[in-house]
């Protein structure tokens, strides 16, 4: 219902089928999305449907935003504006849920070997910072921090065994394969 109010053509059922198809055809596919909470007219029940959908799909990466009124948009003058406090609570609930999902997704990679492109050296930790195919260069995805006994060239691609994870990042060491 909220999607329809936002003039989105997709339905929850269509998206569920699409994500299932993607995961069936490409098991290592990374599912990422952004969601908005507090759109005018969004009820607690509708919010809980969104939360349950996120729990079900288990997105690898998720960004959440609170609706904010912008002049010259259809939503600006819609009735039943959601209170700031309700939007903040919903945002926090989604982000807490996604933190748990992301942490568990990260833990599932421990022991795996990933190809990582090296972007920089973090001088504070003396770890290289990079990304694999699963990490987009934006504000939603994290990094892979790579320990190496040898100096690595920026832009090089190395094999990295994942040793641990936190909510957004993976940590590992260079291996020769």
Residue ranges and their predicted role:
Residues 77-177:
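Terminal RNA-binding accessory module
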Residues 1-61, 67-86:
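Conserved non-cysteine loop/helix-boundary elements of the Radical SAM core domain that shape
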């Amino acid at each position: 219902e909220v999607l329809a109010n936002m003039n989105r053509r997709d339905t929850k059922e269509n998206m569920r089928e699409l994500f299932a198809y993607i995961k069936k055809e490409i098991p290592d596919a990374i599912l990422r999305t952004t969601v908005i909470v507090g759109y005018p007219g969004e009820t607690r029940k509708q919010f809980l449907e969104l939360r349950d959908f996120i729990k079900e799909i288990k997105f690898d990466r998720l960004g959440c935003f609170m609706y904010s009124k912008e002049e010259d948009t259809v939503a600006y003058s819609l009735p039943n504006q959601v209170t700031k406090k309700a939007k903040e609570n919903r945002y926090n609930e989604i982000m807490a849920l996604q933190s748990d999902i992301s942490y568990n997704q990260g833990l599932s990679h421990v022991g795996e070997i990933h190809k990582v492109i090296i972007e920089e050296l973090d001088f504070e930790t003396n770890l290289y910072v990079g990304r694999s195919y699963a990490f987009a260069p934006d504000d939603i995805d994290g990094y892979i921090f790579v320990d190496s006994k040898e100096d690595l060239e920026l832009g090089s691609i190395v094999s990295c065994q994942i040793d641990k994870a936190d909510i957004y990042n993976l940590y590992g060491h260079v291996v020769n394969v």
